[in-house]
Amino acid sequence: MATILTLAGDGIGPEIMTQAIDVLNAVNNKFALGLTLESGLIGGVAVDATGEPLPEETLQRARAADAVLLGAVGGPKWDGIERSKRPERGLLKIRSELGLFANLRVAKLYPQLVNASSIKPEIISGLDLLIVRELTGGIYFGEPRGIRTLENGEQQGYNTMVYSTSEINRIGKVAFELAQTRAQAAGTPAKVCSIDKANVLEVTELWKQTMIELQQAEYSDVALSHMYADNACMQLIKDPKQFDVMVTGNLFGDILSDEAAMLTGSIGMLPSASLDEAGKGMYEPCHGSAPDIAGQDIANPLATILSVAMMLRYTFKQEVAAQAIEQAVSDVLDDGLRTVDILDRNEAGLIQVGCQQMGQAVLAKLL
């Protein structure tokens, strides 16, 4: 029997997690998956309860679990505390401690939401791209880092961006193999676009060269292209359907995946998976804790529900159950239900619903 650790976290985390757990329990029963759910603390609520953003008990339970489902962490309540104790540090630590080096973010536009995006329908209709982000290296983890006082009394902040060939090869393999899988399913040529700033950053010069060597040695059937990060930001808006799989480092991936989220109409629609080398993973919505709307029952739970589908697909290899959730979400959108973030007030026949009503509508499609 497999175990899933649920970590609701802060802000809207508990609201969206409640709906995701209901959906998970439904597919668990419907498809006899044999999954057991546990819960734990992370983020600000963990700081309040234990003084640590990632309590040792939570970390040990996460290591023992087959997968982790996360809500969201952080909020202004904890902005003034010691940096090492802030909620976001718990998230960085659990990713690092579990070896979750590969972050997968799917930007897929549901046809029902084509008018919810700020981009013209003819540019984004049919969008389905995957961003593969290296998650445990780069500037977010590089040492040395800090804020120091110079001899003249001025303060200076500094960080270090580092990648080794082994780290680049590891994330590259994930991207190339996912491109092969997606191409086989779609009946299209496999392609990967590697994002860097090799013109000004030596660390990404190594990134680019390592990707080239990996593709030539092991993945000659996958077309590899390269693009500077600033141009990639522009191209995601100008012509997003030119991409299938994008692979990049931690910093650029963080930025590009949030940009890609808005192509879909709302970051509230984007799930994500963070995987280790064995396929064990942590699954979470791409959005943050949104403390400004917490407790108001207006958050969009669909990204978290779709994260459950990704978990079933990538960690538990339950494709039928994953597709059932995705179809249920699509059916609910067909019915015209919209949380406020994906509501087009100029479109007739839509029904504005809250977090709970949206989650329960998806659940009803699965029963």
UniProtKB/Swiss-Prot annotation:
Swiss-Prot/TrEMBL keywords: Amino-acid biosynthesis, Branched-chain amino acid biosynthesis, Cytoplasm, Leucine biosynthesis, Magnesium, Manganese, Metal-binding, NAD, Oxidoreductase
Pfam families given in the database record: Iso_dh
Cofactor binding remark: Binds 1 Mg(2+) or Mn(2+) ion per subunit.
Reaction it catalyzes: (2R,3S)-3-isopropylmalate + NAD(+) = 4-methyl-2-oxopentanoate + CO2 + NADH
Site, as annotated: Important for catalysis: Y140, K197
Entry annotated with the keyword Metal-binding: yes
Pathway: Amino-acid biosynthesis; L-leucine biosynthesis; L-leucine from 3-methyl-2-oxobutanoate: step 3/4
Principal localisation: cytoplasm
Cofactor(s) this protein requires: Mg(2+); Mn(2+)
Binding site for substrate: R95, R105, R133, D230
GO cellular component, one term: cytosol
Annotated residues for binding of NAD(+): 75-88, 288-300
Listed SUPFAM superfamilies: Isocitrate/Isopropylmalate dehydrogenase-like
EC number: 1.1.1.85
GO aspect biological process, one term: L-leucine biosynthetic process
Binding site residues for Mg(2+): D230, D254, D258
A GO term, aspect molecular function: NAD binding
Top-tier EC class: oxidoreductase
Entry's transmembrane regions: none
Cellular localization per UniProt: Cytoplasm
Top-rank taxon, per record: Bacteria
Function: Catalyzes the oxidation of 3-carboxy-2-hydroxy-4-methylpentanoate (3-isopropylmalate) to 3-carboxy-4-methyl-2-oxopentanoate. The product decarboxylates to 4-methyl-2 oxopentanoate.
PANTHER family (alphabetical): 3-ISOPROPYLMALATE DEHYDROGENASE
Quaternary structure annotation from Swiss-Prot or TrEMBL: Homodimer.
Protein name: 3-isopropylmalate dehydrogenase
Organism: Psychrobacter arcticus (strain DSM 17307 / VKM B-2377 / 273-4)
Gene: leuB
